[in-house]
């Protein structure tokens, strides 16, 4: 007998996920659900699945499954959406929320008005600057290395924001064939657990134009951890200051790499697309 699951589709700067409150709707096989529901033609259509649950360490917990069923350590856009979800659903009246993720406890500050969450600031923690072989184990020092792929050579800066990223600065982002080079860099032998890939152009106003190929999901409209990694890489490569706007296909995020505490703070919107029920 099929089980009916309630869900909410939400998006943060165009990065859309299917959200299930497991406090009220337990989900037995999230890997299968992520693969089935993320498909646009035969499912709900999304970049993946997010489970909102209880936590012994924080106010709530978050688990993220990419469209291919693989589990992600962290998602900045999803964390903002969870802040909006739990507040507007009446699961909390707090405007500062702690969220347990596989990459640690994140602190969310909700910017509200008339009972609605307008924007969310997430303390993304301290970036871990690693070489490719260590980026998944979160040790080592920052490394910029030339990566051969798709008949070209790319100079990448490696940053871990709870998940691995390689940030590549280019003169003209429109010339990047992301569908071709994205999967080759994601699965490059340098990255034992695969990686997220960001191509970045510095715009005349010093903002950062970014396009992303996400590990396990492919091209997406935006990536919160990717925006943070991009801002950090821009500082390390002397291309931007510690406060910057990252402009993606789905919208803009403000990123602040705080010099005092070393933490990265991401601020941006979160929105509900629709709600529904689906059989599992």
Swiss-Prot record:
InterPro entries found in the cross-reference section: DAP_epimerase_AS, DAP_epimerase_DapF
Listed transmembrane segments: none
A Pfam cross-reference name: DAP_epimerase
PROSITE patterns per record: DAP_EPIMERASE
Active site: 75, 223
Molecular functions (GO terms): diaminopimelate epimerase activity
Record keywords, A-Z: Amino-acid biosynthesis, Cytoplasm, Isomerase, Lysine biosynthesis
Pathway field: Amino-acid biosynthesis; L-lysine biosynthesis via DAP pathway; DL-2,6-diaminopimelate from LL-2,6-diaminopimelate: step 1/1
GO biological process, one term: lysine biosynthetic process via diaminopimelate
The protein's name in its UniProt record: Diaminopimelate epimerase
Binding positions (substrate): 15, 66, 76-77, 163, 196, 214-215, 224-225
Similarity comment text for this entry: Belongs to the diaminopimelate epimerase family.
Subunit note: Homodimer.
Broad enzyme group: isomerase
UniProt-annotated site: Could be important to modulate the pK values of the two catalytic cysteine residues, residues: 165, 214
Domain of life: Bacteria
GO cellular component: cytosol
EC number: 5.1.1.7
Keyword Ribosomal protein found: no
Coiled coil (UniProt feature): none
Reactions listed under catalytic activity: (2S,6S)-2,6-diaminopimelate = meso-2,6-diaminopimelate
Function comment: Catalyzes the stereoinversion of LL-2,6-diaminopimelate (L,L-DAP) to meso-diaminopimelate (meso-DAP), a precursor of L-lysine and an essential component of the bacterial peptidoglycan.
Subcellular location: Cytoplasm
């Amino acid at each position: 007998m099929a089980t009916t699951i309630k869900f909410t589709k939400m998006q943060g700067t165009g990065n859309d996920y299917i959200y299930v409150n497991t406090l009220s709707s337990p989900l037995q096989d999230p890997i299968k659900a992520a693969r089935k529901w993320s498909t646009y033609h035969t499912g709900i259509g999304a970049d993946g699945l997010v489970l909102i649950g209880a936590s012994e360490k924080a106010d709530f917990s978050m688990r993220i499954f990419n469209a291919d069923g693989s589990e992600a350590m962290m998602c900045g856009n999803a964390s903002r959406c969870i802040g909006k979800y739990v507040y507007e659903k009446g699961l909390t009246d707090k405007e500062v929320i702690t969220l347990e993720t596989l990459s640690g406890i994140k602190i969310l500050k909700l910017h509200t008005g008339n009972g609605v969450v307008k924007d969310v600031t997430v303390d993304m923690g301290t970036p871990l600057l690693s070489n490719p072989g260590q980026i998944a184990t979160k040790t080592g020092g920052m490394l910029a290395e030339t990566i051969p792929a798709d008949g070209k050579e790319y100079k990448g800066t490696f940053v871990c924001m709870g998940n691995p990223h390689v940030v590549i600065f280019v003169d003209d982002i429109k010339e990047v064939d992301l569908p071709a080079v994205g999967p080759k860099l994601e699965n490059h032998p340098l990255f034992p657990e695969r990686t997220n890939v960001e191509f970045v152009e510095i715009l005349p106003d010093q903002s950062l134009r970014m396009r992303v190929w996400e590990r396990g999901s492919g091209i997406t409209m935006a990536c919160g951890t990717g925006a943070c990694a991009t801002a950090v890489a821009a500082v390390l490569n002397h291309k931007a200051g510690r406060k910057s706007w990252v402009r993606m296909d789905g919208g803009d995020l403000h990123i602040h790499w705080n010099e005092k505490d070393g933490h990265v703070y991401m601020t941006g919107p979160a929105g509900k697309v629709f709600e529904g029920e689906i059989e599992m």
